[in-house]
Regions:
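Loop-to-transmembrane alpha-helix initiation sites
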Residues: 178-193
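Structural signature of hydrophobic alpha-helical transmembrane segments
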Residues: 52-56, 126-141, 188-189
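N-terminal juxtamembrane cytosolic/stromal segments of multi-pass membrane proteins
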Residues: 1-27
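Membrane-helix interface "capping/anchor" motifs
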Residues: 150-164
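Short, highly charged, low-complexity non-transmembrane loops/tails of multi-pass membrane proteins
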Residues: 205-216
């Protein structure tokens, strides 16, 4: 029984070690900054270019993240294989996140359409009468981000994910409600900086193995 508990604790520590490189922090910080830049509402109104640029920014952040994992983390830690319980948690997390991502996408599209198409804007005003429509959309967007990121942090044992979830929720609210990208940009930088510090420390603590060690 003790050995079983010890193995679970070792696996948990090994799973958490995948976050010690700080790359997830950098990735989420970049996502927040791209949101702040490309969701800023211009005076002349939104265009589909805003959406295209935002999606391109997300893809760039993901490519940088995967590339850094492959070129920096994998050569130093190797490929880690986890047990069935941990794999089941990852599958559950993927399903839950898939649902929340779909909700986020729907909210994002609905919000953009409301700004682009007057008829849909009127529909939003009917659903949220008065001057509270923007406040309601902003709160819903922030709540979806906060809940989805918190669920992700729980199932992945990513402890820093809890405060990142809170910061990203605040950033989304400020983006939608105040339309001042400087505040979410600052929040994105606040998320990225600890990630860079962790990445530098990770590289120093885990130098690349020499060619002799690889042959052994």
């Amino acid at each position: 029984m003790t050995n079983s508990i010890d193995l679970k604790q070792l696996e948990k520590r090994a799973f958490r070690s995948t976050y010690q490189d700080g790359l997830w922090d950098i990735y989420y910080g970049l996502i927040t900054m791209f949101l702040a830049i490309f969701m800023d509402r211009p005076e002349e109104g939104y265009s589909w270019v805003n959406i295209a640029l935002m999606v391109a920014g997300f893809l760039l952040a993901y490519v940088l993240f995967r590339g850094a994992k492959k070129l920096i983390t994998l050569p130093r830690l190797g490929q880690v294989t986890f047990g069935p319980i941990r794999k089941a948690r990852k599958r559950t997390m993927s399903i839950i996140l898939g649902v929340f991502i779909a909700l986020q996408a729907l909210l994002l599209v609905f919000t953009f359409l409301g700004w682009l198409i007057p008829q849909i804007g009127k529909l939003i005003s009917q659903i949220f009468p008065g001057s509270n429509d923007l406040l309601a959309v902003s709160l819903i967007g922030a709540m979806i981000i906060c809940v989805s990121m918190t669920v992700s942090a729980h199932y992945s044992d990513f402890l820093r994910g809890y405060y990142i979830a809170l910061l990203m929720a605040v950033a989304v609210f400020l983006i939608l409600f105040l339309d001042r990208p400087i505040y979410p940009l600052i929040i994105g930088v606040v998320i990225v900086i600890p990630g860079i510090v962790l990445l530098v420390r990770f590289i120093r603590q885990h130098p690349l193995p020499s060619s002799e060690e690889n042959h052994e």
